[in-house]
Amino acid sequence: MTIEQLARSTRSVFELHYESLTGLPFFTSFPLNCCQGASVVFGMLVKLLSTQHTVTVVKGDTRDRRESHYWLEIDGLVYDLTLDQFQETLGNRFDGIDTPLYGATKHPLRMHFFYKERHSAVLAFCIFCQKHANTEEVDAALQFVRSKLANLKPSEIELPMATAKLRTKRTITEIRRGKCHVPEL
């Protein structure tokens, strides 16, 4: 499965099961205000693949820092599973924001979300769990999404359940033991 296929499948799971993802803040209104949770979960899914990818979670802020948005850069390409949330408010000023973004070279809102902060997928997961959500609930949501992805097309999913669960548990254990340093933002 390619990263683009995984992104599209993950978005489908989010659309179909957003009401079940209560461990992710704001997911009952998906895609509105769900960018951080969606980016963190998708970033961890990519990190759990058997192939190696450079995954960066990007937080962009407006110039006045009143609005922010999260997306991913994976191997130099942009993935934004919640970009379409801006169609109603920014669609008259920016093109290409009516659907999610899968593997673009540039983010269409790069000039709107001007100031950018970048973190690895694992650090972004740690920050999200420590500052915005409950670690166990986020892990449960991640495992739920993984199980739904496996049910979509089992032959294409490259997420070995035992190995991926072990890696996720190790990250959660590091968070609990305080070994996952979260910088002050």
Task: Please identify what each model-predicted range represents.
Residues 1-185:
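A structural boundary/capping signal
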